[in-house]
Structure formats: structure tokens, C-alpha cells
Amino acid sequence: MANDELMTNDEGRRVMFRHSDFVILSSFVIRASSFLLLIFLPALRAAEKVSILGSKPKWSVLEHYQETITRDEFAHLINDVYCTHGFAPDLIEINEKTARILLNRETQKCFTLRFAENDASRRPVPRLWRPAESLPRAKPERPLSSLRIALDPGHLGGKWAKMEERWLHVGDGAPVQEGDLTLGVARLLAPRLRKLGARVFFIRSSNEPVTAKRPDDFQELARKILIKNGVPQPRVDVLDPNDPEKEQTIRWQSEILFYRYSEIRRRAALVNFKLHPDLVLCLHFNAEGWGDPNSPTLLDTNHLHLLVNGSYLEDELEFDDERFEMVRRLLSRAYNEELPLADMVAKAMAKETQLPPYEYPTTLTTTKVGTSGYVYARNLLATRIYRCPVVYCEPYVMNSNDVFARIEAGDYEGMRNVNGVERKSIFSEYADSVADGLADYYSKARGL
């Protein structure tokens, strides 16, 4: 399940906080970034408005992208991919030869991006990752040779799973913890990708957090957030898991700051400043609302979808750092690589798993893209701040009867009758289908 500003499918369990003109939905939520506003960055000038644990944007970086994109391509990516829900007219102004991008509202300063006159006059796009077309020649049996892939097993698992609310337990069986499941898939996927020629790196290789921070490091910030959002005397601790006001406690908010924001931003630092991959694969399992995790509701529902970055909300674009990150990502052309890649992986996963595509109940946060019917654009923290193409996989509903039975069966070699059907383990099926999709894409893109 998505682990930054939102949960993927369950919008029912949520608590609203209001601040200024923003509606904040916490827990299983649409967005929480406006929840923190500016109060967590006192060192910045009042004119700068940044998202949760974000940094002042370095707009000068965009100078490197001058004349690397035509007006038509820029307008297409803005209107059809990144800003499909619209944006305030003063944020981005697209003219014939330039685009003016607002740096911040208080100063009304803008960055001016110059367009290339045509495709032939475009300057090379500066980036550390390499699109498939620029990779060295490869042998047909090793379509991923020279490719640098970072595996990002979603969530934490282990002792952190209950805190993350990525944990459910049925009867006498072992608890199902998404962070454990995704790490298991990553460990199966890595040798498959290496056999195909890739260099593979783990962003998370254990059930311990990547960030050095812990919830206690965010208690004072959590207290300020709650006071700012109308809770004048916030309680320190949650009374019990069913506490109806747990979202209004310092403990609950400090935990979110730890596992949702600090953790993902630390993973991004590894991706952007150490690993420099050509591709990040975010591995997740999905879920529907399950109620009490000690007595969860099991369903017959099961589905698959993948995510790429895009579909920013108007409120999200009001944050200077999110607007900057969106424009930088657009100019890097990550979308041109990650969408066809996601489509190919989706087709391979659909073929292997026989799962139908997930259909979001609303289009308020997503935009369906591509040709497979399985891929959506959505503005997740990881897909936004990892500075390379990102394919975010969301197969299997963990609390479906069938998936739960397969998870309880564990990993095994070959085929086995599970829940009345002869099949691979769910972990091997996941790993095989992703590897097959990558092989298909890079074989085609590299002309093998």
C-alpha cells in the first residue's frame, strides 16, 4: 500500500483537520501534506512554503534545462500528465517561447524557462539516469545488462508493522505484515534481475528503518502541528488501537512523521546521492479496508494496478518544493521512460496473476494513463522525489481470501495446490512477473 501522503484504496477510515483553506485527511487519507504547512521549518523565510519535512527548492537547478524541451511537449506534459486537475493560473504561465513558473507567492518572483524552437534544436537533457535507448548494446539473453535497478520494498515490517498499520492477524496463523512481504519479494526478484544482466541495489535490505530518526525525535513538531490545527492541548499517547481521537495525539502524529515522511525522504537521499539508479521499483501489496487488524474482514476482492508520478492536485502545487520537484521531473523526461515501462510490467503481471485492473472509486487524485488499463498517474512522495523513472507496483489485496491463503502458504518451489488451485507461490509469481515485464520492455527498447 502507498505509504506517503495517502493510502491507496481505503478512503473510508479518515479524520479531517482543517487549517486555512485546506482540508486535511489523515489516517487512510487522500492528502496530509497541507497538515504541516510551514510550522516545521522555522529557519526558512515566511515567503517559502514547503511540504512535510521538505527543503527550500533550488530553482537555479532548472537553468540546466534551458532549451531542452519544446513548447508543445512541455504543454502536453503539464496538461495531460502532471497537472490534470488544473492549477492556479499564476503558478505556471505557458507562452510561445517561454514558460514562467512562480517561485513563491509572497515575492512574486518567477523562473523563466526557454523552450527549444523545435525537436532538432533541443539541447541534451541533463540527468544521471539513462534511458533504455542510451544503454550499451546487450545480448538477447541479457536484456538488462548495464542497467542499474534499485529495489524499494515498501514499508518496514517487523516490529514496526503495527505502528504503520500494515499488519493483520487471522486465527492462529502468522501475522501478515506488508513490509515483510515486500522484502521477501525483493529478495526473490534481485537474483532474477541479475541473471538478466542488471546491477541491483536494495534501498531497504532489512526490517529496520533507513532513516536514523525515530518517533520521539518528532514529538515537539507533532505537538505544534496539532495545536496549529485546532487541538490546543493534545494528548501525548493513544489510549488504545480503537481510540477514536488517536489522530489527535502527539504519539500518533510523531509516528507518521517518522515512518511516512522521514523514512521516505531518507530513502530518496540514498537514491539521489548514492545509488544513482536508472530505475526504481517500488514493491507493495494492496489492501481494502479490513477493520480490526486482530479480526480483519476478508473479502473476495482482488486486483492489480501500477503507479507513475503525475496527477498533482491544485493544493499540492501551492507548495513551492512540490511545484519545483514536479517541474524538474517533467524536464528530466522520466515519464517518457516510466510510462511505457510500467505498461509493459503491468501487462506481464496481469498475464501471470490473471488479476483485473483496479478502478479508483473517484478521479480526484489519479489519472489513468498508458495503454494497458492498469497504470495510473498519482503524486506520491516516492515517485516524486526519486530522481529517476519509478514504477510503483500494487498487486494483490492482502485481506482477500485468496491472497491471504497464498501468503499463509509461504514461499515454495514449483507448483502447489493452494486454495484449490495449482500455482506458484505468490512471492515467486510477483517476482517472476516483474522480471518478465522488465525483460520485455528492455528487449524491445534495445532492439534485441
What are the language-model segments listed below?
Residues 36-46:
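Hydrophobic h-region of N-terminal signal peptides that target proteins for export
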Residues 1-36:
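Arg/Gly-rich low-complexity intrinsically disordered repeat tracts
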Residues 46-448:
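Catalytic-site microenvironment of enzymes
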